Structure formats: C-alpha cells, structure tokens
Amino acid sequence: LYHLKPDGIMTIVLPHGVLFRGGEEGTIRRNLIENNHIDAIIGLPPNIFFGTGIPTIIMVLKQKRDSTDTLIVDASKGFVKSGKNNMLRAGDIRRIVDVVAARADVEKYSRLVSRDEIRENDYNLNIPRYVDSSEDPETWDIYASMFGGIPANEIDALSPYWEAFPGLRGELFDVQPNGYAQCKDDPAAIVNGHASVLEFEENYRRAFDGFGDFLHEHLVSRCETVKVSREENLLTQDIFTRLDGIPLVDRYAAFQMLHEQWTTVSLDLEMIQREGFDTIRAIDPHMVVKKKNGKDQEVQEGWEGRIIPFDIVQKTLMPEQVKAVAELEERLEQAQFELTDLVDSLSEEDKMELSDVLNDDNDAFLATPLNLSLIHI
C-alpha cells in the first residue's frame, strides 16, 4: 500500500483463513478496515489453483477511498470442472468484474457491508457472515407424496416465471379444495399457446431485430479493419443492451456463448488482416493421426477451409446435395443394421453353408466374397 499512488489499486490472492483468524491477522484486518483500505473481497471456488485445494480469495485494496463500505462477493459457486481442478469461465469472470465495478448488491452473490457492521462482527470478514449463497434446503411434502397433488409452495418457488408470464399459472393448474394443485392435461401446449409466452417470444425477437445485420457490419464488412481486441466488448455491450428488460435470460450465460465463439472468430479476423482477404478462399491439407506399422503418424485426409469450414459452404450453397448425401448415409446405416440382424438370425448350420462369405467370427459378411456370390445368382 505504501508504494501505491493515491488512486492506485492492489489485488492479492490469499487463503480464505485470513478473513477470520485471530492474532496478528486480526490486527491487520482491523487496521485495514479502520484506515479504509479494503475495497472488495471476492471469494473464489475451491481447488482452482494447481497443487492446492484450499479456498482462496482476492482482496482488493486501495490507498485512498471515498466510501467506507466494503463489497463482499461470494463467487465460489461459479465454475466448471476441468480435470481434477475447478475453472472459472469467462462468464464467471465477467460477472465478478461487473459486480465489483458497479459495487452492486446481488442476492446470494454480493453485498455492500458498512464499516459499522464489520466492527460489530469484531472485524471478522468471513464471507458467509455477510453473503448467504447456499442453496435453499430441499423439502418433501408427505401429504402430496401419499395422496397426490402439487404443494402450493413448490409452485410459488417458480415465481420468476409467473411474473414473466402473467396468467400462465392459473391456466396450468387447478387448485383443489385441500389447497393442493393438479396440473392440467398437455401443459406443453398450454405454455406454447399462452398469450404471455407468445408476447415474451415476440419481445425477444424484437430485441434482437437487426442483430444479424449488426454482426455483418462489424465482422464481415469491416473484417480487414475491425479492432479485434475491442470488438468482443462492443458485441457484449450490444447483447447486454438488447437483453435489458428481457426477464429470465442470464446475460452472463449469453456472454459465455459469445466468448466461446469469439475465440475462433478473433483468430479468423487476425488471419484475414495478416494474410489478406483472399485467405478466405484458401484451403489447407486436413491432417489426421493414424496408426501405421504400430506407430502414430500424421497423414493427410482430404482438405479443409482455412477460414470457412467446408460444411458451412455445403449447407449454404448445396443444401439439396447435402440432404441427398444424408439420406444415403441413413439408408447405408439402416442396411448395415439389417445385415447384422440377418447374420444374427442364421442358425449354426446356415453359417457353415455360408462360411465362404462370412468372417472368421461368423458375425458379419465379407464384402468381396459376398459380391462375387451375388454375381453368380
């Protein structure tokens, strides 16, 4: 902190225990809080660092701050498994960044905690004291299990959907005199045909009206000049703006989908800008690894587009031919199943008579001998 500029920011990765252990660590926490240095504490998932499974935090420190509160973020639930470790996804990181930048209170995720509250807790900064990110306990209704019906509290738990689709709840359920509900027949048809659902779908389509043209303008028309390093953020902001006012859709799930595609898109754009527009038409050998003489060897197996995959070209310019090939492949697969069934239905005596056209295991036909036999029929 001493070496920071007045407006400087320092982040430290620490084990979770520094937030609540006593002794000198408790004294350090007290001094940091009283001198208004702790801007945010971000709890990370366990097991995200190789070699250790202990939970960790990121502590954000500032030398000078205008506010005296501290943002507590519990990001321990946002991760995916990656081998033996956990891994933060791009969407998880973006959620953390946005919450910290906005210093936002988000239920079960983050909370601004006053210095007075921290004092009352004797400078204990253990994250669960301030943010409860635990799942709601699962409950079982014995009456419903024995006599049927849906408890009202289970339907109430879906309140975000009833708020997004007004009137749908009443159309889906009949409430019995005992207070339990019965779902009406064909709920999928009720949902898909309900006015509030149709309105939601229309609002969603309207929000993304022109999105394709926006992408074409940014990524196709300007592919040779677009600033690749800035473009993902521009696309993200556009998507977030379009999703404003659209309930139920997790904007960070949408960002994750964009980011996963952007990894490929950005590489393509950089290649076009480096090699020129004609690289879009270039093809390269498609190399695969095959066993040869007991060793793995890389060999060419056809060709592939350097930028545009062949399957996109085929589906766009030759849809009828692609459909015909798919139908032939389906027929071939069906014929193979029928041949297998035919072999399975043969008796041992039949297999002896057909030994010239069956393999050594008598479980499949040999193509060449079988074709020769058919010629003589």
Where are these regions (language model features)?
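Calmodulin-binding IQ motif helices
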Residues: 377
